[in-house]
Design a protein with these regions (language model features):
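Preference for protein termini
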Residues: 1-463
Length: 463
């Protein structure tokens, strides 16, 4: 597992995305790479077509297999259920429904949860029975919508175990699970998962043990004194909302007051920014020149029952989430006989030496391709990096081992929750827990994401 260094910052067992966005990113990135090499041959051989760079393929395969387990070879409808206000804007959900419909006997439909109906106890859409449902929101959102709109058909689908991800993952879909993995129970989990888990504690007035094994009498006061080394995050947050990072957000009192006011936060040891940074070429439009910009990276691993579906590369500031203004980055497997660092340095130097006007044309092509593919998120067009993030075949093999260990350890967490061992740490309301108990996971079809702050060999060298 030392083929790459770093930590996972969080896991998503609810409804992780990015599986189709990376497919589009690869198409755009490969075209940009070809254009860059037309300007100046770079001399680095890269593979943009490795199967794990297209995670949607494994995800769709899992959905089709889940349908076949229930319905055999019979035709059927697979529903992609998302919040009503997102139906016209989230491109990958639109593409998923279209992709499912391209298979013989399968109809994929994107819909809001209110469009489901019950007919003689069967969950249907416009009178047609539904086989499998991918739900693109977590159970807290489901419960809130149910209170407004009466979503009994969707809850019936949960009871019938038609929903992916199973709602039984929700109690362990909280960032405080890192306290379990890295705490007194660490011996029950894979060493590589434990070693990649940053020190984490539920944030409230308490005594606990610090990152170095030191006794902490008052976690709140300790956090204030050590703020530059820490991060505060909502236990169930997404898109970077509510996150406060030491140094990046220097006002410790504001961060702590926010966490205490909102409640249900975790405090986490900050992963050094240099570990998960890379230098990327960008166009400085004011100076009309090409420059290197230091960006933070995020490497999402998406895992299913059989192992890795693939990856999503993101980059930007802190946090890197697309919902917080970050972008996506093409990924490429290195085929040349050189190190990752040498490959990235050669790419950066070549792009820095290119004519600004010619590169402007490449960026315009990149933007045109993004529009053609409706490459947008809720905030609008998604930024795409000019050069790919480079990884090796050996690193992919290690990431596959990491994915298997992650799946196994999440199953251990569910077993601990079902046995009552996590009752003191899982703090979600009773109605939501009832939904979780309707559909235990137990390793059934699901997509799990781990967001890695990893260094594959191209992080900035110490100056």
């Amino acid at each position: 597992m030392q083929d790459f260094t770093g930590y996972h910052s969080e896991w998503n067992l609810g409804s992780p995305g990015g599986w189709d966005y990376q497919r589009i990113t690869q198409i755009i990135g490969k075209a940009v790479w070809s254009a860059l090499n037309t300007i100046t041959p770079i001399g680095v051989d890269l593979d943009f077509d490795h199967p794990l760079l297209f995670p949607v393929n494994g995800f769709v395969k899992m959905l089709l297999e889940a349908h076949e387990v229930r319905e055999g070879k019979n035709p059927g409808l697979i529903a992609v259920v998302a919040e009503e206000e997102t139906l016209d804007d989230v491109t990958e959900n639109i593409n998923l429904a279209l992709r499912l419909s391209s298979f013989d006997g399968i109809t994929g439909v994107l819909m809001s949860p209110r469009q489901l109906e019950l007919r003689n106890g069967r969950v249907c859409w416009r009178g047609q029975a539904v086989s499998i449902i991918f739900v693109d929101f977590n159970s807290d959102v489901l419960l809130g919508l149910h209170r407004k709109h009466d979503l009994r058909p969707l809850l019936q689908a949960v009871r019938q175990k038609r929903v992916i991800n199973p709602r039984g993952t929700e109690p362990i879909n909280v960032k405080s699970m890192f306290e379990v993995v890295g705490g007194v129970h660490r011996g029950r989990f894979h060493p590589e998962i434990v070693n990649r888990t940053p020190w984490t504690r539920q944030f409230h007035a308490r005594r606990t043990v610090g990152p170095g094994g030191e006794e902490i009498d008052d976690l709140i006061e300790w956090t204030y004194r050590h703020w530059s080394e820490l991060v505060l995050k909502p236990e169930r947050g997404y898109s970077g909302k509510g996150v406060r990072v030491g140094v990046v957000n220097p006002d410790a009192r504001e961060a702590i007051d926010l966490a205490l006011r909102e409640g249900s936060y975790i405090v986490q040891k900050k992963v050094p920014l240099g570990l998960w940074a890379e230098d990327n070429p960008i166009l400085d439009q004011e100076q009309r020149r090409v420059v290197l910009e230091r960006c933070q990276t995020d490497f999402r691993c998406m895992v299913g029952p059989g192992g890795l579906f693939g990856f999503l590369g993101r980059y930007g500031a802190v946090p890197t989430n697309v919902g917080s203004g970050g972008g996506v980055q093409p990924l490429a497997v290195l085929r040349s006989d050189m190190t990752i660092r040498d490959a990235v340095n050669r790419i950066n130097e070549a792009v820095l030496g290119m004519n600004y006007g010619e590169l402007t044309g490449v960026v315009r092509m990149q933007e045109r391709l993004a529009v053609e593919h409706r490459f947008t998120y809720l905030l609008g067009p998604i930024k795409v990096a000019l050069r790919p993030r480079v990884i090796s075949v050996r690193q992919i093999q290690s990431l596959n081992d990491y994915g298997h260990a992650l799946w196994s350890d999440c199953l251990m967490l569910e077993k601990m929750w079902l046995s009552g061992e996590l009752d003191e740490i899982v703090k979600i309301e009773d109605e939501e827990l009832e939904i979780a108990r309707m559909q235990p996971w137990g390793g059934s079809p699901a997509i799990i994401a781990s967001d890695g702050l990893f260094d594959f060999g191209a992080s900035p060298e110490p100056s």
